[in-house]
Amino acid sequence: MDSFQPLFEQLFGSEWGVSLFLLAKNLLLILAIIIPLLLAVAYLTFAERKIIAFMQVRVGPNRVTFFGIPWLGGWGQPIADAVKAIMKEIIIPTGANKFLFLLAPILAITPALAAWAVVPFSPELVLADINAALLYILAMTSLGVYGVIIAGWASNSKYAFLGAMRSAAQVISYELAMGFALVCVLMMSSSLNLGDIVAGQQGGSFLNWYMIPLFPMFLVYFISGVAETNRLPFDVAEGESEIVAGFHVDYSGMAFTIFFLAEYANMILVATLASIMFLGGWLPPVDIIPFNLIPGVVWLLLKIAIMLFFFLWFRATFPRYRYDQIMRLGWKVFIPITLIWIVLLGAVMQLPEAALQSFPLNLWF
């Protein structure tokens, strides 16, 4: 791609050419992330419907196909759903704040997409390789709740407002638990750079992955990620049987679809971060032939798919928790466990070098 830089310099001059080339390069890299992500979101909805249908002994979507090919039945369903959503009218309720009503979906989707700027798919395949990547992701994922709160308030509906308040309290509660769980990863890797975190898990086998010594933190992080994305069994922000549809009860058409995209993009982000920080990222489970011949991106995508399967499995299996049960789990279970684990991990890391070299501590320190 850098071979096009002289062409830009010839067309626009030395100074402008370099600036325009860098701008075009970054825009192409952004599109190279966003377009596959949106396709992944679309087909994650298809996978969800097929997997849950299988668990409930149903068929699932099997009609919409490409070019009439029978064995592709159902694979065109996400495209059909997207076209239908685009063609639907966006109805703004009477008494709603029109500007904020339309701004809320944008505020929800923007952080969900912006967080991917620092996510590495391999040592070379990353848009922005910054040293504070983990801090940046925590900041971006925290901003998504503003779109939900504004949507609930701008709708001028008590059901939407209740859903927004539930979502805000839930995100604040589980954001703390997620942050404390990631502090343990930071302590073990001594870095906020996601590439360095993966490099710290190298060692020849899955026994060096942070999931082994930090297994309780892995569970806390993943369950908190499910709660933060408002997925079952933590979907009290929507709560169809309680508050109709929560914060997006009055949304329709593309505005509703953007909320939908943000939720599924956040699901993929949580699964990706769990794979990078606890499951070795793009590292193979065993560094021997034939495992190390498979590209690292394939290993990362496989781990992400496994994590996403658990998201879908939870939806088909568990009933919705009550709101008070969700708050109790976050504040009285997860946060105390993470704080205790941080203290224990810090104490272990202060042991003498001889103790750290004994089995099994020598696997992890």
Curated annotation (Swiss-Prot):
Q: Which InterPro entries match?
A: NADH_UbQ_OxRdtase_su1/FPO, NADH_UbQ_OxRdtase_su1_CS
Where are the bilayer-spanning segments? Answer: 27-47, 99-119, 133-153, 168-188, 206-226, 268-288, 294-314, 329-349
GO cellular component terms given for this protein = plasma membrane
One of the Pfam families matching this protein, by short name = NADHdh
Report the EC number(s), separated by commas if there are several. 7.1.1.-
UniProt catalytic activity = a quinone + NADH + 5 H(+)(in) = a quinol + NAD(+) + 4 H(+)(out)
Q: What class of enzyme is it?
A: translocase
Q: How does it sit in the membrane?
A: Multi-pass membrane protein
Q: Name one GO biological process term.
A: aerobic respiration
List the keywords (alphabetical).
Answer: Cell inner membrane, Cell membrane, Membrane, NAD, Quinone, Translocase, Transmembrane, Transmembrane helix, Ubiquinone
Source domain of life: Bacteria
Which GO MF terms are attached to this record? NADH dehydrogenase activity; oxidoreductase activity, acting on NAD(P)H, quinone or similar compound as acceptor; quinone binding
Enumerate the subcellular locations listed in this protein's record, separating them with semicolons. Answer: Cell inner membrane
Can the keyword Acyltransferase be found in this entry's annotation? no
Q: What is its main location?
A: membrane
Q: According to the UniProt record, which cysteines are disulfide-bonded?
A: none
Indicate the quaternary assembly. NDH-1 is composed of 14 different subunits. Subunits NuoA, H, J, K, L, M, N constitute the membrane sector of the complex.
Report the function annotation for this chain: NDH-1 shuttles electrons from NADH, via FMN and iron-sulfur (Fe-S) centers, to quinones in the respiratory chain. The immediate electron acceptor for the enzyme in this species is believed to be ubiquinone. Couples the redox reaction to proton translocation (for every two electrons transferred, four hydrogen ions are translocated across the cytoplasmic membrane), and thus conserves the redox energy in a proton gradient. This subunit may bind ubiquinone.
Would you identify the family this protein belongs to, as annotated? Belongs to the complex I subunit 1 family.
Name it.
NADH-quinone oxidoreductase subunit H
The record lists the organism as Nitrosomonas eutropha (strain DSM 101675 / C91 / Nm57)
